Amino acid sequence: MARYRRRSRSRSRSRYRRRRRRRSRGRRRRTYRRSRRHSRRRRGRRRGYSRRRYSRRGRRRY
């Protein structure tokens, strides 16, 4: 069990590092969140493009 715990800790640390880097770019994160809200209105125009992009990244994240 000790080995497993060590592995999980290293994994969580790498995740936190990625999140911290994104937070430092705070502006980008906010724009992404806003675009998701307005994506419903623009879905009619860019159906294939927005769906492919957000379905792959958005679903895995959230």
Swiss-Prot record:
Similarity comment: Belongs to the protamine P1 family.
Entry's Gene Ontology molecular function annotations: DNA binding
PROSITE patterns assigned: PROTAMINE_P1
Tissue expression as described in the entry: Testis.
GO cellular component: nucleosome; nucleus
Lineage of producing organism: Eukaryota, Metazoa, Chordata, Craniata, Vertebrata
GO term, biological process aspect, one: sperm DNA condensation
InterPro entries: Protamine_P1
Renumbered residue ranges of the record's region Disordered: 1-62
UniProt-recorded name of the protein: Sperm protamine P1
Taxonomy, superkingdom: Eukaryota
Function: Protamines substitute for histones in the chromatin of sperm during the haploid phase of spermatogenesis. They compact sperm DNA into a highly condensed, stable and inactive complex.
Cellular compartments annotated: Nucleus; Chromosome
The organism of origin for this protein: Sarcophilus harrisii (Tasmanian devil)
